[in-house]
A protein has these predicted regions:
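A generic structural signal for short, solvent-exposed coil/turn residues
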Residues: 8, 146-148, 161, 183-186
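A structural signal for short, hydrophobic beta-strand segments that form beta-sheets
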Residues: 83, 156, 187-190
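C-terminal motif of bacterial Sec signal peptides marking the signal peptidase cleavage site
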Residues: 14-15
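...with weaker cross-activation on analogous glycine-rich loops/strands in unrelated enzymes
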Residues: 33, 91-175
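Sec-dependent signal peptide recognition
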Residues: 1-8
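N-terminal capping segments
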Residues: 19-124
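Low-complexity, Gly/Ser/Thr/Pro-rich intrinsically disordered linker/tail segments
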Residues: 164-197
Length: 197
């Protein structure tokens, strides 16, 4: 009995002397940034061809993608399924998303492609999250979505362009995911801080 008591005391003492390790739970924004940066390590061919995909949580094959797929995949890593959010909104407001086709009676919702179109993402953010649109480039922060016109989109990460206070962005402009300085044409940029979590 004395041996057992001595053993338990020794184990308790040893356990008390060890430094405690706490696991840090990542925020959704940290998950998004980690996934955007992880995409830089992947071999992805630029391919915007139409493909049937699952719904919900559908994605084109991991080895292909376009600029919107960088955003969609990054947000999905934090539990945000843009495919579902955008599909449901487009389905309920075709006249907003496709005004010309709506007038002609040819508008239709498509869960395979709508969320992969830059102009649809822009309209979705403007309509449902107008307070997320920011004006000044001084306000840019990691996790912000940057949209050029209706043709291109990327996301800022937590790495700065050397010698500046500007954050790099991740996008796919034709050669797979890449890290770039996004501030080359500020007049065309729209800037969103979208945190739907």
């Amino acid at each position: 009995m004395k041996l057992l008591t001595l053993l338990l005391i020794s184990i308790s003492f040893y356990a008390c002397t060890q430094t405690s390790t706490t696991l840090k739970v990542k925020t959704p924004t940290e998950l998004i940034l980690d996934h955007a940066k992880w995409q830089l390590t992947q071999d992805v061919n630029y391919d915007g061809s139409y493909r049937k995909i699952d719904y919900p949580n559908g994605d084109v094959p991991a080895n292909i993608g376009v600029c919107t797929d960088v955003i969609i995949r990054s947000y999905r890593s934090a539990g945000v399924d843009m495919q579902v959010l955008i599909y449901e909104d487009v389905k309920n407001d075709l006249s907003y998303y496709y005004p010309i086709h709506y007038k002609r009676g040819t508008a239709k919702v498509d869960p395979n492609i709508d969320h992969r179109r830059v102009h649809i993402i822009r309209k979705f953010l403007d309509k449902n999250y107008p307070d997320t649109k920011l004006k000044s480039t001084d306000e840019y922060k990691p996790g912000d979505i940057i949209i050029w016109g209706n043709w291109h989109v990327g996301i800022l990460i937590d790495e700065k362009v050397p010698g500046t206070d500007r954050y790099y962005g991740v996008h796919n402009i034709g050669a797979g995911p890449e890290k770039s300085d996004f501030y080359y044409d500020e007049e065309e940029l729209d800037h969103y801080r979208w945190k739907p979590f």
